[in-house]
């Protein structure tokens, strides 16, 4: 199966990010309308939000009016899989764009807004939001191998660099404090990225499936880390933090959170076939061991009382070594994962 299941899961995560900001329940209930190639929904103030585009244009100028109503918002899924788009112009009427709506536009090279746009600006075809100095969308069809995020940018939006396969190096300035969910997911040529000592939060799966990353260092400034941000990074061999990091620790390149003694990320590029989780660890995070193909055995101590979703996803060769009458034993049974006891004389394979 390889990583196909995790890519599918990641696409769901990206869509959930989009739905979260758009409030999916409301989207399902509200009525949508059509104007030419556009689908849109009415907002409470009488303006409209573009919810879909069905055209095949390569160079698209989004209208500022649809059926006589002002376009003020672009839904986060409006331009998904618009593979014909090469460039797009966003009108001054648009006031709201949250999660990258162009994440699946495989040929998109440039996003443009006017220099007088009240809410957004673009530099070299990359889209930013003025209010919070946030990078929203780096077009995935751009063929640059190196990109330097401008100084002064404070946030990288969820999915901002999603699946940008040409990039080998991204420089993040020390003005950035937030890296969103899936921000660099599937950037599989990315060999080097330095997280500055200004970042305080790293979102779910932020660097997942970056198959060329071999090492990464988390600075002392980082206070929050979501679901394994390095899941399924097949070449990643080590995660580093300083010995004095206030919130996180690493042992043999494996990342732990101090507050709840949780194992967050086991690098998928570690070549060892066996791993013993340290005694005293109480939790294994979501996707913590994702796509660790080389592992054949993980020993879980009786101190572990919580194991997250997909913690051992796509570990096809894995057998868990678990204590009798433990939480880990029940987890293995429930999830149909082969297991054995530490004495190795009582084998079960349910």
Positions of the model-derived regions?
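Positively charged n-region of N-terminal signal peptides that target proteins for export
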Residues: 1-11
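Short N-terminal segments immediately surrounding and downstream of signal-peptide cleavage
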Residues: 27-39
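Sec-dependent signal peptide cleavage junction
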Residues: 18-30
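Structural signature of tandem-repeat unit edges
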Residues: 37-46, 55-73, 82-96, 105-126, ...
């Amino acid at each position: 199966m390889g990583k196909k299941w995790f890519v599918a899961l990641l696409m769901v995560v990206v869509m959930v990010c989009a739905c979260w900001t758009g409030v999916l329940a409301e989207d399902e209930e509200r009525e949508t309308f059509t104007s030419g190639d556009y689908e849109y929904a009415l907002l409470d103030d009488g303006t409209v939000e573009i919810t879909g585009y069905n055209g095949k244009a390569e160079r698209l100028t989004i209208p500022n009016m649809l059926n006589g109503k002002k376009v003020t918002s672009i839904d986060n899924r409006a331009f998904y899989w618009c593979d014909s788009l090469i460039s797009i112009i966003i009108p001054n009427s648009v006031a709201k764009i949250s999660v990258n709506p162009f994440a699946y536009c495989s040929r998109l090279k440039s996003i443009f807004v006017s220099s007088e746009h009240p809410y957004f600006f673009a530099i070299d075809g990359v889209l930013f939001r003025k209010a919070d100095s946030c990078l929203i969308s780096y077009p995935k069809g751009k063929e640059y191998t190196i990109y330097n995020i401008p100084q002064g940018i404070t946030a990288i939006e969820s999915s901002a660099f999603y699946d940008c396969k040409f990039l080998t190096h991204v420089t993040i300035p020390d003005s950035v404090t937030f890296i969103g969910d899936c921000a660099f997911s599937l950037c599989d040529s990315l060999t080097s990225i330095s997280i500055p000592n200004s970042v305080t939060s790293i979102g779910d799966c932020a660097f997942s499936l970056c198959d060329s990353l071999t090492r990464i260092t988390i600075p002392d400034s980082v206070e929050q880390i979501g679901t394994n941000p390095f899941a399924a990074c097949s070449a990643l061999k080590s995660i580093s933090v300083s010995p004095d990091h206030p919130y996180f620790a690493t042992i043999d390149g494996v990342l732990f959170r101090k507050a709840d003694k949780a194992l967050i990320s086991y690098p998928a590029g570690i070549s060892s076939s066996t791993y013993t989780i340290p005694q005293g660890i109480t939790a294994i995070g979501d996707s913590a061991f994702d796509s660790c193909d080389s592992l054949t055995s993980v020993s879980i101590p009786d101190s572990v009382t919580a194991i997250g979703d997909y913690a051992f996803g796509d570990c096809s060769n894995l057998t868990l070594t678990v204590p009798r009458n433990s939480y880990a034993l029940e987890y293995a049974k429930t999830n149909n994962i082969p297991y054995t006891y530490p004495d190795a004389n009582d084998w079960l394979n349910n």
